[in-house]
Amino acid sequence: MRKKQFKAESKKLLDMMINSIYTHKEIFLRELISNASDAIDKLYFKSLTDDSVKLAREDFKIHIDLDKESRTIKITDNGIGMTAEELENNLGTIAKSGSFNFKKENADNEKADDISVIGQFGVGFYSSFMVADKVEVISKAFGEDIAHKWVSSGADGYTIEECEKENAGTEITLYIKEDTENEDYTKYLEQYTINELVKKYSDYIRYPIVMEMSHQVPNPDKEGEYTTEVSEETLNSMVPLWRKNKSEIKPEEYNEFYKQKFMDYSDPLHVIHTKTEGQATFDALLYIPENPPYDFYSKEYEKGLQLYSNGVLIMDKCADLLPDYFSFVKGLVDSADLSLNISREMLQHDHQLKIIAKAIDKKIKNELTKMLKNDREKYEKFFKTFGLQLKYGVYANYGMEKDGLKDLLLFETSADDKPTTLKEYVGRMADSQNDIYYACGENAQKIALLPQIEAVKEKGYEVLYFTDEVDEFAIQMLMEYDGKHFVNICKDDLDLSNDAEKEAITKKNDDAKELLDKMKDALDGKVTAVKLTNKLGSHPVCLSAEGYVSLEMEKVLNSMPGANQGVKAQLVLEINAEHPIVDKLKGASDDDLKKYTNLLYSSARLIAGLDLENPTEFSDALADMM
């Protein structure tokens, strides 16, 4: 026996492997269990292709043994095992992967579909040195008579020698480090810790992972006393729920899995279970919660799906699998097609992941579309909870996703107590109606009281009520729907008149030009114009906006954190040409006209939901007029 150096013999490289690539020391167990599963897969594959191998699937298992006194963890499998040469190649060369080579060599074998070798890079084994200062590997290759022992204490090298081992397989012993001021290594010798780590990372490895577990049970001979019982238990569930056929799974199984996996007390609102084959093959189990997570609206909330590779947890929250507008979706994806980086924790942003993300996005949209069509009550409940995310999705990224989301939007409306889709609105439009009308406000009740609403409804036109801050921004990204443009009824250029009505109102404005100019001057730059209008029904006055920034946009933009209150809509004060107040204004003195004008302006601001610029001045003027 002689000591050998690693072929990638740099201590710096090994230090990088165990200190930089992996951010959580606990994943060493996941890596070793995955390696053991790979080894069993290889022998199981051999049993499928070689009749001389008399082994059945139920013969395979992975053992974990803990010894607190010697501070060791032992992971044993009865898989394919390794020869001295394979130990040299697989463990003596950092980043050499036997599993990857095995997959490559058997890529064309149809029976290779019956196994699922996890490893792609030969780095996982070296994560052992994050928790152990010495690692011992005893392995006997299937069909060989001689076993070999590989021993290393880290970057200084390793030894290989012959040894005794009765059966084929591999036994890895980790000599756990002593605790330090900053690190508790002893916890990895506790059965509770190991049990939890297996359930967290390796619950769906398809071979039994067994360990002796001790439990305190009542002593039947002495009341009040307990005795310790030790028995071998299987720690993993082995069969992932998402790998089963949907027809075999009861709704309560989906619900219980969700509540246990994602720590929710309520059943999910909707379950999406899909298997996709094609450019990328994957299983996905997705949940739409009934209620938003408690931290959903906080900066700390992290979106993402759990990502598995052949049943092994690779990433707890893979944000790249979900667009922001579906950030509320919980669930997981399991695929063997993903290209893994040298650490399973650092998934490459590769082409396969993008294909999967695109397929998931499409699947969720299709499910929501079906829900909207077939279960309206359920969809309205969903939209009330998460509809805001879809609206932001329309607005975000310059409207890149608007076409895929626009038919999922719901809005309150003047025509019904129930919310409507854009498609439904257009389907109800009057023959004479060319545009989609909307108004913005704090809630539907306040919007319904806007002066402009009356005239639009008198025409037989429906008005969409935009009650979320993002609504108008999203609609401006859409620009039009089914060839119909969106029109804000609170803009000064709202056109509901025929030619004769337009001619009449133009003449009235021309005749009252001197009065209107005085009123504009009285407002001292607060408005860009004062004009008479025929679109207010029975109401005396309103504020409208001209240009891009609407009244609602002004409120929203100036309410944002850090806003400098500099965003202003170009306001227009509109006076009802048919209201008696016009005659009052025409007969007023210059001083009274100024007071009337400011009162009307302040009243119009209140009606529009804007703050008064000078409440005291308004109150004094009102009292004076009384």
Features from the language model and the residues they span:
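GHKL (Bergerat-fold) ATPase N-terminal catalytic module, capturing the glycine-rich phosphate-binding loop
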Residues: M1-Y188, E196, A430
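GHKL/Bergerat-fold ATPase module in large chromosome/replication-associated machines
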Residues: V117, V135-G157, K177-K187, Y192-M626
